[in-house]
């Protein structure tokens, strides 16, 4: 098996090394990841300048681009054909609305766009101590997916509590929860007195009840959320069609 590993925390992040080492027991692992932290990069792709790649002493490839750049580069000619893409282990949660901004999830999505099964895996906690737990779970999921293919346009978004493996209460298939709107921006001033702005903290949980990814984590379970790349809202078709029929367009 040939496995591509990427992330958004950067090629030197602890999570990616632990993940790659664990997956190496299943086959050949190639690591292609950003040269620095690119958290929040979402699905951005670099189109206005070339990408530069550096191979590190440990064999990993460092790219001066986004997580999506890394996977796109790897799967469209930079590497030999690959069987599966695993993105992570992210240092922090990717729950609910987080997936809209997550470079970790985006790297997995790019793998799926390019025809491969893909998993995004994140650790939930403030000072991550148990990356090995997520790495072992990722390995088991890769084994399962090698024999049981996911439907097209589907990835798995996996969140793991920062706990020793023997304290994990199980795995739950979940839906995305939601957060309230983000907190206001934070305004500060640079040494020259000019205003600068920081994006505010994410909003608190709004929908975090049973069945959500938030709830699974709170109860000590691994959350596994199947995400679909087709974002069409099919249930709205009839209502929207009726609404549009009321609009008169004249030349």
Swiss-Prot record:
InterPro entries: SurE (IPR030048), SurE-like_Pase/nucleotidase (IPR002828), SurE-like_sf (IPR036523)
Pfam families according to UniProt: SurE (PF01975)
The keyword Iron-sulfur is annotated on this UniProt entry: no
Location in the cell: Cytoplasm
Cofactor list: a divalent metal cation
Alphabetized UniProt keyword annotations: Cytoplasm, Hydrolase, Metal-binding, Nucleotide-binding
Protein name per Swiss-Prot or TrEMBL: 5'-nucleotidase SurE
Name of the encoding gene: surE
């Amino acid at each position: 098996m040939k496995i591509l590993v990427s992330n958004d925390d950067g090629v030197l992040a602890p999570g990616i090394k632990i993940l790659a080492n664990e997956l190496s027991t299943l086959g050949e692992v190639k690591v292609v990841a950003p040269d620095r932290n690119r958290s929040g990069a979402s699905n951005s792709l670099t189109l206005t300048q070339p990408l530069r790649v550096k191979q590190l002493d440990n064999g990993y490839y460092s790219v001066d681009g986004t997580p999506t750049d890394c996977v796109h580069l790897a799967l469209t000619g930079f590497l030999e054909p690959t069987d599966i893409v695993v993105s992570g282990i992210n240092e922090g949660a990717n729950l609910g609305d987080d997936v809209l901004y997550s470079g970790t999830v985006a790297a997995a999505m790019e793998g799926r766009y390019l025809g491969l099964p893909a998993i995004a895996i994140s650790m939930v906690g403030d000072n991550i101590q148990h990356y090995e737990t997520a790495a072992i779970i990722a390995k088991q999921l890769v084994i399962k997916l090698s024999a049981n293919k996911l439907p097209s346009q589907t990835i798995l978004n996996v969140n793991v509590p920062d706990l020793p493996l023997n304290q994990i209460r199980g795995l739950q298939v979940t839906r995305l929860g939601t957060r309230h709107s983000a907190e206001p921006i934070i305004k500060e001033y640079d040494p020259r007195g000019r205003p600068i702005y920081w994006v505010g903290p994410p909003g608190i949980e709004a929908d975090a009840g049973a069945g959500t990814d938030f709830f699974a984590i709170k109860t000590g379970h691994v959350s596994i959320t199947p995400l679909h790349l087709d974002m069409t809202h099919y249930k709205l078709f009839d209502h929207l069609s009726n609404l549009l029929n009321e609009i008169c367009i004249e030349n």
